[in-house]
Amino acid sequence: MEDPKGAWQSDVFDNGRDFKPHDKAPANVTAGTTPPMYNVGAGGSEGNSKALSIISIVLRCLSIMFNVVSLGVIASNQGKSYFVVWRTLNSSNMQYLFAINVIVLVYCVVQLILSIINLVQGKMVLSGPTQPASTITYICDQGLTYMLMAGFGAGVALQASVDKGESGMLDCSGANEFCGKNKASAALSFLGFVCIALSANLNYLRLYFMAAK
């Protein structure tokens, strides 16, 4: 029968031998070692941030333009049927769309001013994806997106009833300027909605790029 202590006394175990303590753990990365993959491309993340900042400013400018034109069309649009003058703002649907466009316009102007100030001061145009300012901007963008979509739906519903002659307003069975402007104002509001909706997701697109690095 073999000695049961043979394995213990072999080189497999340290056999209680003392080892000299070390003050420092060995370095994980030695000279000449390739850097970890997640450190590569830090400059690319910064480039993505700059590109998204420019896109954010462009979307704000486009939204302002669409809303200004839409407000002008809604406020000035009127038509005449016999001795009755019809105005777009006589409709509660268009009043709602007009009010939403005003709110979105003011909000986008404020956001654009803040972006320009940050650019002049050399700061980031877009806040970090996890910062409170970014969350507040996202919530405002999302809320205004839904409000604009509701306003667009109200404008389309009004125009559909006008086309069918069920609104009590001008008859739009034929082509006329009044009905054309109604449709144009709704279309411009929809384009403003698209710009706000895209802007609402820019910070989270940045977060995706950061996580992909």
Curated annotation (Swiss-Prot):
InterPro entries: CASP_dom. This is CASP-like protein UU2. Glycans are attached at residue 90. Keywords: Cell membrane, Glycoprotein, Membrane, Transmembrane, Transmembrane helix. The keyword Transmembrane helix applies. It comes from Physcomitrium patens (Spreading-leaved earth moss). The keyword Kinase does not apply. It is a multi-pass membrane protein. Signal peptide: none annotated. Homodimer and heterodimers. The chain crosses the membrane at residues 54-74, 97-117, 138-158, 185-205. Residues 1-26 are annotated as: Disordered. It is found in: Cell membrane.
